[in-house]
């Protein structure tokens, strides 16, 4: 499985689309706004650029993408008015892997711009937008061309499934029953990927440029702790139930692994300091409930829909597409039972960085 070819959120605007099932991600963007705001204020008030070049890496599609744009424009507009400056030109780069539904994203752009003008007037901008398909573990932009990089709920995804994890049988991710060699392989791949990410962004950002990165993570130093692995363990349970029913072959489940690593703040700090291109301004964690909806009665349904929007393309690349409704029905039942018995939360790691040279 080539991750770059199959990793993307469900496109379009249907029942299983990411656009209609990304409330958790929206809440996280709103929760991290104070950190984003401070980073952008510090950047703008130190450089006062006439053109502000911003990249959203792992932008996906839907309202959340435009929520980020709206936040950043409003922050800059408020700050430039304090100094009596003319509004800068804004140049937003939307980056994601080639399978992302860029068509749906850009079809929504006109309505978003009109709505933004209604809220903050005509005096800002102009705004320019471009789509940049490709892996953010490679170079994406010209040298020293960016002022600000933003990424939310993307950097936990790996560039590939780690090598040497063939013995992770019965699991689809790191789990309490995973051999130590599997845990080490996942961390090794994460360290390689995140180091490359920092290296390439340091080449693309100008001196003093900022990054605000939010990713799924954990507070525990145990990479198999429930706070980061449990959601995937429950999906593995759903798949294994279909194995028991003879609908999926056991070896198919054994051969499937999620290309993701959810780091601790200490791991993020270690890799940033080891790579050496950035200083850490803030490094924090936050929590958000699996069920971001206020509708508690349908918690299992809401969470399974959210996870389907995220994971279905990966699953379809390996399993029969016709089984997806059944897989996520089983998953919903398992999640509902789990949520009735215990507290279920995602842990977010947020880091604000400044490029040194």
Curated annotation (Swiss-Prot):
It is an enzyme of class 2 (transferase). Pfam families: Methyltransf_7. It comes from the Eukaryota. One of its GO terms (biological process) is response to ethylene. Pathway: Aromatic compound metabolism. The lineage of its organism: Eukaryota, Viridiplantae, Streptophyta, Embryophyta, Tracheophyta. Mg(2+) binds at residues 168, 254, 256-257. Optimum pH is 7-7.5 with salicylic acid as substrate. Optimum pH is 6.5-7.5 with benzoic acid as substrate. Belongs to the methyltransferase superfamily. Type-7 methyltransferase family. Predominantly expressed in petal limbs and tubes of corollas. Its EC number is 2.1.1.273, 2.1.1.274. Keywords: Magnesium, Metal-binding, Methyltransferase, S-adenosyl-L-methionine, Transferase. This is S-adenosyl-L-methionine:benzoic acid/salicylic acid carboxyl methyltransferase 2. It comes from Petunia hybrida (Petunia). Induction: Triggered by EOBI in flowers. Fades out in flower petals after pollination, thus resulting in a decrease in methylbenzoate emission. Strongly repressed by ethylene. Benzoate binds at residues 25, 157, 260. The gene is BSMT2.
């Amino acid at each position: 499985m080539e991750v770059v070819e199959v990793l993307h959120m469900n496109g379009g605007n249907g029942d299983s689309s990411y656009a209609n099932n990304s409330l958790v991600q929206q809440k996280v963007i709103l929760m991290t706004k104070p950190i984003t705001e401070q980073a952008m204020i510090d950047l703008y008030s130190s450089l006062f650029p006439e053109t502000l070049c911003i990249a959203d890496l792992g932008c996906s599609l839907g309202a959340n993408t435009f929520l980020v744009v709206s936040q950043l424009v409003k922050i800059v507009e408020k700050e430039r008015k304090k100094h009596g400056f003319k509004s800068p030109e804004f140049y937003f780069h939307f980056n994601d892997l080639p399978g992302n539904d860029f068509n749906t994203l850009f079809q929504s752009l006109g309505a978003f711009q009109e709505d933004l003008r209604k809220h903050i007037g005509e005096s800002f901008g102009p705004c320019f937008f471009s789509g940049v398909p490709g892996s953010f573990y490679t170079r994406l932009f010209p040298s020293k061309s960016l002022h600000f990089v933003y990424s939310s709920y993307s950097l936990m995804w790996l560039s590939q499934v780690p090598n040497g994890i063939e013995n992770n049988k019965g699991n689809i991710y790191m789990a309490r029953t995973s051999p130590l060699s599997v845990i080490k392989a996942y961390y090794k791949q994460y360290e390689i990927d995140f180091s490359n990410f920092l290296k390439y962004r340091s080449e693309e950002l100008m001196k003093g440029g900022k990054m605000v990165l939010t990713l799924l993570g954990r507070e525990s130093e145990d990479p198999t702790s429930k706070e980061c692995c449990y959601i995937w363990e429950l999906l593995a349970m759903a798949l294994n139930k279909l194995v028991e029913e003879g609908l999926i072959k056991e070896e198919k489940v054994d051969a499937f692994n999620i290309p993701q690593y959810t780091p601790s703040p200490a791991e993020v700090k270690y890799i940033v300091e080891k790579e050496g291109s950035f200083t850490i301004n803030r490094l924090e964690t936050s929590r958000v409930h699996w069920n971001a909806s206020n509708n508690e009665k349908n918690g299992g349904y809401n969470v399974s829909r959210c996870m389907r929007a995220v994971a279905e393309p990966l699953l379809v690349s390996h399993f029969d597409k016709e089984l997806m409704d059944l897989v996520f029905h089983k998953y919903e039942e398992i999640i509902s039972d789990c949520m009735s018995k215990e507290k279920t939360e995602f842990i977010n790691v947020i880091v604000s960085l400044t490029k040194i040279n």
